[in-house]
Amino acid sequence: MSVDPPAGAEGVLPLLAPMLAVIGPPPGPEAEAEYAYETLWNGARVIAHLPGDGGLRLLSQTGMDVTAQYPELHSLASLLPGGQAVLDGEIVTLDENGRPAVERLQQRMSLHQPDAVTHAREDLPVQLMLYDILYLGEPVIQLPYTARRDLLDDLALAGPGTSVPAAWPALAAQALQHSLAEGYDGVVAKRLTSPYLPGRRTRDWIKIKHMRPDKR
């Protein structure tokens, strides 16, 4: 599923809607090894377009251009000079303990005026957590998750304002334990053999939330 390009867009890179996860329990013991497990960020989903000319365009889950709202993320383009890529990830605002702070992110997302955005870069800085790749010189959505993840890791895109968080292949219990200990809300299980399915919600991606006694 693709989204309509914004007015004036040249459409050099494919405009793809993000793949979506279902909410459910962890895969059973017989299927646990068929998935990798990633941190559940509860951030603002974005598709990052790197056309290879030093520019960057960030599209929200609904296809809105939100690039101007997050100027501190523009340095991502310098990490892939001359390369064309489309990346999937989430924008988060972290608290003093390095954990996602949803309220702080909502404050940041509400800002649109340049002066307000500039001021918020200090008080409400954001981080882009990258976890998938859709295009690298050519479409790669048909590749299995493991191959796409290898491509993403090889790009070494960690830098100011960007991270490529680790995945836990076939280690559901460890991933859930780590997530709970670090104060995250859960993990996302991603089937190792699954292609990237733009705009579709399937059990290839399963959002697994912690059941805490204080959250009923």
Cite the ranges covered by each PLM segment:
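Catalytic cores of nucleic-acid ligases and guanylyltransferases
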Residues: M1-R216
